[in-house]
Amino acid sequence: MDPLAQGHEVVILSRSGGDFQWDVSYGYIDPAAFEGVDAIVHLAGAGIAEERWSAARKRELVNSRVRSTAVLYQALSTIPHSIRAVISASAIGYYGADTGEAECLETSPAGLDFLADCTKQWEAAVDQIASLGLRVAKVRIGLVMGAEGGIFPVISKPIRWGLGANLGSGKQWQSWIHITDLLRIFNELLINPALSGVYNGVAPEPIRAGEMNKQIASALRKPFFLPSIPGFLLRLVLGEMACLVLGGSRVSSVKIEKDAAFSFTFVRFEEALKEILHV
């Protein structure tokens, strides 16, 4: 994330490196990290798709989000500061890994699977910060697309090798967002004091997984003819986390467009694809 381009002076709070250190396991934040700071962008959390979901890994996924937020809450409760707003990442996983054809609004209920429960606990921890009188906003982020960041390098790799195939039916909805628009949403939430609560961080036009794959293959001038990989095989290999590739959701961007008069730079996936691949 590069808010510097938006005119912000940024200090980084990290477990290692960065400008200031914190240690979630010990509940410690360097008090100097808050000096002269008027807003926090909270992005902490272990990667959802980096490891198979063992019981221990699932605990880590939840704890890395909930405990880091609790440490932040405790610090904001006790350390003198001039912070007025906290903008936190969240995820469209709040609605569940697979919501079928239903359109998910910010008011839609949470899903019932692990992904939804993890995100629900995360958001509940973030909401505690609002009790301190600070403005709090959460961004339920979809599939982030960028040349080097987000999910695009992962999903495009097998296609680049000529080994692209749909995972499951290919009919799953993919609610995506170009990284540039995601940064613009975070920036809008930082600078606009009228915005609080939860916002979906997705582009206006979701796309079916199969169509997304075909567009990537076409842009890369690669064949896309291999048969779909069946769901049972993916569940056998990936276990519970197969829901990440077999499920999908159709998430609405209307609220951020209406509340912030926000206009997306990349509305359709093919527009984002052209920018990412420079075609």
Can you name each region flagged by the protein language model?
Residues G17-V71:
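NAD(P)H-binding glycine-rich loop region in Rossmannoid oxidoreductase-like domains
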Residues A70-D113:
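Conserved Rossmann-fold NAD(P)-dependent oxidoreductase catalytic core, especially the SDR/UDP-sugar
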Residues A209-K214, R235-S263:
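Conserved C-terminal active-site "lid" loop/helix of NAD(P)H-dependent oxidoreductases
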Residues N63, T99-K138:
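Catalytic helix-loop patch of NAD(P)-dependent Rossmann-fold dehydrogenases
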Residues V267-V279:
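Amphipathic terminal alpha-helices
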Residues L189-E240, L277-V279:
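Mid/C-terminal beta-alpha module of Rossmann-like enzyme folds, strongest
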Residues S156-G164, Q172-I207:
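Alpha-helical substrate-binding/gating segment
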Residues D127-K138, G142-W173, I179, I216:
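NAD(P)-dependent short-chain dehydrogenase/reductase
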